[in-house]
Swiss-Prot record:
Protein source organism: Clavibacter michiganensis subsp. michiganensis (strain NCPPB 382)
Family per record: Belongs to the methylthiotransferase family. MiaB subfamily.
Keywords carried by this UniProt record: 4Fe-4S, Cytoplasm, Iron, Iron-sulfur, Metal-binding, S-adenosyl-L-methionine, Transferase, tRNA processing
Entry GO MF terms: 4 iron, 4 sulfur cluster binding; metal ion binding; N6-isopentenyladenosine methylthiotransferase activity
Domain MTTase N-terminal: 19-134
Subcellular location per the Swiss-Prot or TrEMBL entry: Cytoplasm
Name used for this protein in its record: tRNA-2-methylthio-N(6)-dimethylallyladenosine synthase
Listed InterPro entries: Elp3/MiaA/NifB-like_rSAM (IPR006638), Methylthiotransferase (IPR005839), Methylthiotransferase_CS (IPR020612), Methylthiotransferase_N (IPR013848), Methylthiotransferase_N_sf (IPR038135), MiaB_methiolase (IPR006463), rSAM (IPR007197), rSAM_horseshoe (IPR023404)
Length: 528
């Protein structure tokens, strides 16, 4: 077995050029947000993005939810071993949930890795990289509890128009298939004033959309004793001037209450979109999963949401092949999926995760049976998604243009973005029309539907109806800054986004006033 020392090379003098980095992200939206923090921490420490070139530092932010996450990590590390042998001074860091779980195993399987860090100490990455270079040996640092709330760390957003905002970390649920609570700990809630201050800072930087993140967002407030805190938070965020779109993920059906539905329906900035994880349609399987709701309660939630928000697009998560799942159980899942009419679904084949109660359950379902059921489920959901998308054809929707969503936009002369309900829309740019910038809003008529996206082709080749936004202005200024040319005059008073935002700002008086409405008068000690 080789050692780290065999892979370490002398680093070129810092004066020659800044060291470059690449962050690779696997897993959920929490990981995407974490990677923005890792990127911000690296840039604050003087590293620069490799921008597609071979990087001096490769950081892999891992997921531990499914078995293929392990295979993907070690496959990537095997490839990087050869790259590192010929790339003088290269360093490799592994973080996130799988690193938190496997710890020293990462270094045993891949001794050429320089740094292993966990979910609770992301901010330590630059220090660990420097220590590994100085000492010439791998650095393994895993903490058992949160070192600092991630939103206090520097960040670099992928999308100027949009931002992630963590409202909590960790989870108090005990789902038998899930490893996340063991890796991210018990739920810790941020104070409402801190959350609103971060949203305000994002808006000041040009963002017009935020997504509130938590393992179970609608249990937000458990730490300070307010069961209606999440609904209040939605309303307070919706009052922030300049914030046009609010999304959140993920809620838990057992704790999803009508006050949240009311807040969604009565707050214009909250988008008509809901991600509600089903996991299984079988009550027997839900009980074995320790999902403290049953299928009829789940469908009742969807009915109440659609009563208040008729055009809401509802998405879900479903696991196929949980231990003990029979054909009858699976038929119940198909029944609920047909009744629920999800606009899309994230479907997974059950994967044994050591350390979870489900891993040692009897009656593990054979892989070929799981695969066959998975095929039937995805075929059903694809049909439903197509039918639900076809209902949108002929409607006029507003699309927030993205910089990174459309892979073939250049070949098709289209731009891509998200409708208010979260659906992906590819829209045609007619010859002679102005072209929307990332962050601008475009009003289009949907002309075609596919299972996974909508298309808005120009029927009469008329110019696009573009609403130029502060986010588009911020994107344009950022482009000018990166090219070293003067930025065009801003159309609004909002300043351009810094390349790296250095953590949470201090609160402004107006934000503190808004926060009080969330905290509630019954808990004055928790005011920001």
């Amino acid at each position: 077995m080789s050692t780290l020392a065999e892979h370490v090379r002398d680093t070129p003098p810092a004066a020659e050029r800044p060291r470059t980095y690449e962050v690779r992200t696997y897993g959920c939206q929490m990981n995407v947000h974490d990677s923005e923090r890792l990127t911000g921490s690296l840039e604050a420490a003087g590293y620069v993005s490799a921008e597609g070139a071979e990087a001096d530092i490769v950081v892999i932010n891992t997921c531990a939810v499914r078995e293929n996450a392990d295979n993907k990590l070690y496959g990537n590390l095997g490839h990087l071993a050869g790259v590192k042998r010929r790339h003088e001074g290269m360093q490799i860091a592994v973080g996130g949930c799988l690193a938190q779980k496997d710890r020293a195993t990462v270094l045993e399987k891949a001794p050429w890795v320089d740094v292993v860090f966990g979910t609770h100490n992301m901010g330590a990455l630059p220090t660990l990289l420097e220590r590994a270079r100085h000492n010439g040996e791998a650095q393994l640092e895993i903490l058992e509890s949160l070192e600092t709330f991630p939103s206090t760390l520097p960040t670099k957003r992928d999308e100027i128009a949009s931002g992630w905002v963590s409202i909590s970390v960790g989870c108090n649920n005990t789902c038998t298939f899930c490893i996340v609570p063991a890796l991210r700990g018990k739920e810790k809630d941020r104070r409402p004033g801190d959350i609103l201050a971060e949203i305000q800072a994002l808006v000041d930087d040009g963002a017009v959309e935020v997504t509130l993140l938590g393992q179970n967002v609608n249990s937000y407030g458990v730490e300070f004793g307010d069961r209606q805190a999440f609904g209040k938070l939605l309303r307070a965020a919706g009052a922030i001037e300049g914030l046009e779109r609010i999304r959140f993920t993920s809620p838990h059906p057992a704790a999803f209450t009508d006050d949240v539905i009311d807040a969604m329906a009565e707050t214009p900035a909250v988008m008509p979109q809901l991600h509600m994880p089903l996991q299984s349609g079988s009550d027997r399987v839900l009980k074995a999963m320790r999902r403290s709701y049953r299928s009829e309660r789940f469908l009742g939630i969807l009915d109440r949401v659609r009563t208040r928000i008729p055009d809401a697009a509802i998405t879900t998560d479903i696991i196929v092949g949980f231990p003990g799942e029979t054909e009858e159980d699976f038929q119940e899942t198909l029944r609920v999926v047909e009744a629920a009419r999800f606009s899309s679904a994230f479907t997974f084949q059950y994967s044994i995760r050591p350390g979870t109660p489900a891993a040692t359950m009897e009656e593990q379902v054979p892989a070929d049976v799981v695969k066959e059921r998975y095929g039937r489920l995805t075929a059903l959901q694809e049909r439903i998604s197509h039918e639900e998308n076809q209902r949108v054809v002929g409607r006029t929707v507003e699309v927030l243009v993205s910089a990174h969503e459309g892979r073939k936009d250049g070949d098709t002369r289209r731009v891509t973005g998200r409708a208010q309900d979260g659906r992906l829309v590819h829209l045609d740019v007619p010859a002679g029309s102005g072209e929307p910038r990332p962050g601008d809003a475009v009003e289009v008529e949907i002309t075609r539907a596919a299972p996974f996206h909508l298309i808005a082709d120009s029927v009469d080749q008329a110019p696009l109806r573009i609403r130029r936004t502060r986010a588009g202005d911020a994107w344009e200024r950022a482009q000018a800054d990166s090219c070293g040319v003067p930025a065009p005059a801003a159309g609004t008073s909002a300043g351009g986004p810094p390349r790296v935002s250095l953590g949470l700002p201090s609160l402004r008086a107006s934000t503190i006033a808004s926060a009080g409405a969330v905290d509630g008068s019954a808990h004055p000690r928790h005011r920001a």
